[in-house]
């Protein structure tokens, strides 16, 4: 009995030693793994062995391929006098431009501004019911700065509802309202940059209501410190050929 008991105690000590070693290994591994993980603002992050933090949920920033002039062969530009200027100075021969002076977002559905080529004039919705486009650009807002914001957005939403129904496969871009010059903004109670900013913010919110409508911040391509530079044009509102090309380049890089 004594010899068996000694063997039993010896085996028991050996077993306890093995268990202790296993627990130690697990503990060391847990510490090492813990050093690779941390919480940042409530989000779990992984620290690679090199020591740089990297979010496990981080998604890459959106990237765009620069499009060439051929992209605009199936594009339509609709808008007011600023859109008309862009169409005139852009040197893009292939896109269709339906824009004219004094056209506003409430008038665009009913105004017959599209020449069919046979002498017949039709509305933009009539044309969209006959011709499919890959992309449609809309530019309104300068002439509507004196309106209540709610009136402007209601009319814009009505037009977007019509276009998205007629062209469900098209990418539709709502172009931001360009700022005016610092001098005009400081002197005019209607055409001023605080009003432009309010309307642009409302347009961004409107675009979020649609799956295939995107807000295109073309203002950032020409504005300097939030205003239209003095050398852009003569009236503080419209722009010249040089700045038309800046806008086109921005579009090519952001669609």
Question: Where are the regions that the model predicts?
Answer:
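N-terminal Lys/Arg-rich, disordered targeting/topogenic segments
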Residues: 1-13
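Hydrophobic membrane-insertion alpha-helices, especially the h-region
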Residues: 17-31
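Catalytic His-Asp segment of secreted/periplasmic serine-dependent ester chemistry enzymes
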Residues: 31, 180-255
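N-terminal, intrinsically disordered, polar/charged segments of Gram-positive cell-envelope systems
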Residues: 34-74
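Conserved SGNH/GDSL esterase-like catalytic core that processes O-acyl groups on lipids
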Residues: 65-155
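Loop/turn elements at helix/coil->beta-strand transitions in domains of secreted/extracellular proteins
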Residues: 71-74, 131-136, 167-172, 210-214
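Active-site segments of SGNH/GDSL-like serine hydrolases
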Residues: 139, 143, 164-196
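Charged helix-capping and loop-helix junction motifs
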Residues: 151-159, 193-196
């Amino acid at each position: 009995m004594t010899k068996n008991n000694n063997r039993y105690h010896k085996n028991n000590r050996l077993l306890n030693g093995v268990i202790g070693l296993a627990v130690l290994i697990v503990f060391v591994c847990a510490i090492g793994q813990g050093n690779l993980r941390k919480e940042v603002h409530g989000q779990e992050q992984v620290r690679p062995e090199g020591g740089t933090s990297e979010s496990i949920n981080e998604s890459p920033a959106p990237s765009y391929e620069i499009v060439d002039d051929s992209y605009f062969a199936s594009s339509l530009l609709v808008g007011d006098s600023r859109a008309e200027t862009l169409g005139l100075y852009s040197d893009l021969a292939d896109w269709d431009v339906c824009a004219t002076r004094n056209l506003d977002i409430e008038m665009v559905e009913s105004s017959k501004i599209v020449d069919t080529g046979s002498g017949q004039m039709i509305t933009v919705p009539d044309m969209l019911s006959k011709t499919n486009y890959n992309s449609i650009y809309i530019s309104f807002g300068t002439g509507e700065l004196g309106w209540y914001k709610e009136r402007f957005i209601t009319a814009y939403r009505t037009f977007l509802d019509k276009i998205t129904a007629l062209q469900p496969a098209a990418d539709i871009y709502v172009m931001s309202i360009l700022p005016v010059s610092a001098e005009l903004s400081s002197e005019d109670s209607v055409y001023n940059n605080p009003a432009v900013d309010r309307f642009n913010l409302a347009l961004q919110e409107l675009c979020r209501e649609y799956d295939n409508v995107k807000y295109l911040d073309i203002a950032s391509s020409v504005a300097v410190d939030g205003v239209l530079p003095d050398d852009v044009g003569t009236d503080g509102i419209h722009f010249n050929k040089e700045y038309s090309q800046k806008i086109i380049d921005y579009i090519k890089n952001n669609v």
